Regions:
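Serine residues within intrinsically disordered or low-complexity segments
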Residues: 20, 32-33, 44
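N-terminal catalytic or cofactor-binding beta/alpha core of small enzyme domains
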Residues: 43-175, 180-283
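Short hydrophobic alpha-helical segments enriched in small aliphatic residues
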Residues: 15-17
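Polybasic, lysine-rich low-complexity intrinsically disordered segments
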Residues: 22-23, 27
């Protein structure tokens, strides 16, 4: 298992592109003299100040909220499959993360279930040897059967999704990798992940995201319980960050109904996007 791979129950996951890591992260720009409207203090305890690099647009990547393709999956035990789907689908993250229409916020949603085709896997994914590459062949002791026609269709979707994601990005984009995880995996409410490479946001941006969630009363993990963020190669640099929501902060995991905090969380995320975009107009 590579150092980024995480085991979620019976599913081996590293949906964030380990292969994209390279030596030599971007140098952090010098601080500006402008101070944020609120007294946000970072991990070092100092007052957070403006950095030079901000964003012209935000791209929301929502890869694991879909359920399409489940009906065509051939496997040893369909009941066991549906148990895994229930647990590991990022239920309703599209409804939580996507704000009201904003021309500077784009989104892409995989409508296929990750159990049909996982659009965040790598073409030469190390998990392929465990039967959990782009097309999962093994999970929870079950064997899946895929004929060549079905494989061709699923791989075509994989390529199309990744091409569309890349087309949304520019050198001044912030890519937000949007996920959720079962509540029994961690006591963290929200996990913030990033790569230690060219795609890593400045410490200021990371601190801003973390501190805003903390101000709303959430317990925040940094690259824990999960780490990294998707960062497909495009030929230019941009920033990428992962936001993983503990399902308990927005969902009743038994009934699959939104809880009372769900609309608040959606507003809090929208406010975060606005803050990240607003400052790009001022620097």
């Amino acid at each position: 298992m590579c150092k980024v791979c995480k085991r979620r129950g019976n599913i081996l996951l590293h949906p964030h592109e380990e292969e994209s890591k390279k030596k030599g992260a971007e140098k952090v720009p010098a601080e500006s003299s402008r101070v944020l409207p609120k007294d946000l203090r970072g991990r070092s305890g100092i007052l957070l100040r403006m950095k030079e690099r901000w964003y012209e647009n935000i791209v929301l990547n929502i890869p694991h909220a879909g359920v399409r393709g489940l009906e065509s999956i051939k496997c040893d035990n369909k009941v066991n499959l549906l148990t895994e789907v229930r647990r590991w689908t990022d239920w309703f993250t599209d409804l939580i993360f996507i704000p009201e229409k904003n021309d500077r916020i784009k989104h892409i949603i995989a409508d296929f279930s990750r159990f049909a085709v996982d659009v965040e896997r790598l073409l030469d994914d190390p998990l392929e040897k465990n039967g959990q590459g782009i097309i999962y062949m093994k999970y929870n002791g079950q064997q899946r059967y895929v004929d060549e026609k079905e494989r061709t269709k699923l791989m075509a979707y994989y390529y199309d999704y990744n091409d569309r994601l890349k087309s949304m990005l520019s050198e001044h984009s912030l890519l937000i990798d949007c996920h959720s995880f079962p509540s029994d995996l961690s006591d963290m409410d929200i996990c913030i992940g990033f790569n230690e490479d060219w795609s890593k946001p400045t410490d200021f941006v990371i601190d801003l995201v973390v501190e805003l969630f903390k101000q709303h009363g959430y317990k925040v993990g940094i690259n824990m319980p999960f780490s990294n963020a998707i960062a497909p190669e495009t030929g230019y640099t941009y920033n990428s960050i992962m936001i993983e929501l503990n399902k308990r902060v927005y969902l009743n995991e038994e009934t699959f109904e939104f809880n009372d905090n769900a609309p608040k969380l959606r507003e809090q995320l929208a406010s975060l996007y606005s803050l990240l975009l607003r400052y790009s107009e001022e620097v």
